[in-house]
Amino acid sequence: MVDAINPLGTDGFEFVEYTAADNTGIEQLKHLFSSLGFAEVAKHRSKEAWLYRQGDINFVVNAQPHSQAEEFAKVHGPSVCGMAFRVQDAASALKHALTNGAEEYKTEIGPMELSIPAVYGIGGSLLYFVDRYGKQSIYDVDFRFYDDAAQRLAKSDVGLYEIDHLTHNVKRGNMDTWAGFYERIGNFREIRYFDIEGKLTGLVSRAMTAPCGKIRIPINESSDDKSQIEEFIREYNGEGIQHIALTTDDIYQTVQTLRDRGMDFMPTPDTYYDKVDSRVEGHKEDVSRLRDLRILIDGAPLKDGILLQIFTQTVIGPVFFEIIQRKGNEGFGEGNFKALFESIEEDQIRRGVLNNA
């Protein structure tokens, strides 16, 4: 519903778009998504683009020559070049965004192709507005589905079913700029604020959410020039989407299946699990299973329930994925932020990026 509270009429994420600079990079993206349980179900009718799907999650791999995706890949390498919001009326959403300072992305539309309005978002990536979703979707027009798409979906699924949140890394001094961007165009509001200090570096983060409650975007900014946020920006050659969090209802089974398929996750020190019972009192999870699979748990505060989460290693340049299961907790793992931050920091020390002298 479009109103003063929800001026874009948002209703969740529709897709995330990925690209790479060459065929090898594109094939690596396809292999990665297959490993994550996504099925390639369709190809664009007129472009070099493919649709990967799992549950209600849509990933688009874009290798179209002479496109925004190609230009984006020249700068960033394998990367996230766009994301789409579900909205009630795409044309109305575009008009509202432009009125409030967004810059329109304009491109030529091919024959028999839908015009999907878009503006420039984080790091020059695109933010699309999509008002055809669900049973009548944009893919029905622009893509040709494979005859065995249903079988592919059933065979590949690991239990992931929606995008929980999508995190930005920005340059120092730009966190409020991008928070303001989402406030202006979509009346997003800050629901969490973090100030995390590791042993040697730190970050601050503002978690923004859309009025519909289905689009959550934490925005991270470094406190110094050596943190993992700054390293991301150097490697990515700019600001961008740091990670995509995907929801499951059975994180134990999902993670076990992903590990069996060869997915690598960020390491968590044993000492983390020694402190779980005291840090999250009354959680009722099997700590031995958490430890075996290296799943993180948080309940800050416990009265709001708990959440379980785990992070892959970086898999698209410096971009990674999060697997999350919420059991009443709508946070972002605040209690795990510091543990994870220090885990990445220890990896930076091992790689010589930080000097623990």
Curated annotation (Swiss-Prot):
Q: List the disulfide bonds.
A: none
Known PROSITE patterns for this protein?
VOC
User: Where on this chain does Fe cation bind?
Assistant: 165, 243, 322
Q: Where is the VOC domain?
A: 12-132, 162-313
| GO biological process annotation, one example | symbiont-mediated cytolysis of host cell
SUPFAM superfamilies with a match to the protein in the record: Glyoxalase/Bleomycin resistance protein/Dihydroxybiphenyl dioxygenase
Listed A to Z, the keywords are: Cytolysis, Hemolysis, Iron, Metal-binding, Repeat, Toxin, Virulence
Report the co-factor binding details.
Binds 1 Fe cation per subunit.
Q: Where are the transmembrane segments?
A: none
- Mind listing the GO molecular function terms for this protein? 4-hydroxyphenylpyruvate dioxygenase activity; metal ion binding; toxin activity
Cofactors needed by this protein, per the record, are:
Fe cation
NCBIfam families of this UniProt entry?
4HPPD
Q: Which PANTHER family match?
A: 4-HYDROXYPHENYLPYRUVATE DIOXYGENASE
* Family, as annotated: Belongs to the 4HPPD family.
* Annotated protein name in UniProt: Hemolysin VllY
